[in-house]
């Protein structure tokens, strides 16, 4: 994981966030027609990534032209949207650890490029539990359950391929 690499500096962090934005922004657009009851706008990560990139020195013109991932997982129904969201929502838990690492190593906080790492702030736990509760109550057929699982697997794989292609994994 880049965050723990000895060569990981502020420039590498900025490049990593650029790649994260290139994955999250188009994927969030793809998710937007599904699962309105989960308050997709509240759960969006791309706005926090933009704030971080601007805090780290990128201009709006530069962030408007960032490359976006074209190898996204398919989101064709609520079941696949849930699989994608499982990965994206779960990452907020890891962000809680990474925000402390970035604060200690580079002095990054909410205002200076760390908003994405703490995107839900004190609501991280409750939003994660709310998502799990929704997932638990979702009545899915065996085929839909398989789509949810496959979408989660595809999201992990797509994200890793994207980060490798952007050459941000140290």
What role is predicted for each listed range?
Residues 1-170:
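Metal- and O2-centered redox machinery and metal/ROS homeostasis
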């Amino acid at each position: 994981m880049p965050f723990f690499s000895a060569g990981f500096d502020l420039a590498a962090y900025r490049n990593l966030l650029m790649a994260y934005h290139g994955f999250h922004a188009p994927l969030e657009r793809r998710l937007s027609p599904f699962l309105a009851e989960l308050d997709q706008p509240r759960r969006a990560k791309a706005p926090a990534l933009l704030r971080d990139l601007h805090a780290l020195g990128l201009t709006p013109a530069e962030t408007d032209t960032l490359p976006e991932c074209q190898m996204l997982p398919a989101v064709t129904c609520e079941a696949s949207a849930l699989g994608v969201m499982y990965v994206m929502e779960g990452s907020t838990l890891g962000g809680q650890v990474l925000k402390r690492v970035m604060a200690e190593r580079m002095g990054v906080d909410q205002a200076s490029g760390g908003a994405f790492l703490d995107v839900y702030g004190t609501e991280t736990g409750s939003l994660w539990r709310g998502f799990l509760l929704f997932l638990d109550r979702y009545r899915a057929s065996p085929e839909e359950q398989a789509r949810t699982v496959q979408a989660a697997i595809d999201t992990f794989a797509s994200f890793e391929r994207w980060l490798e292609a952007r050459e941000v994994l140290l």
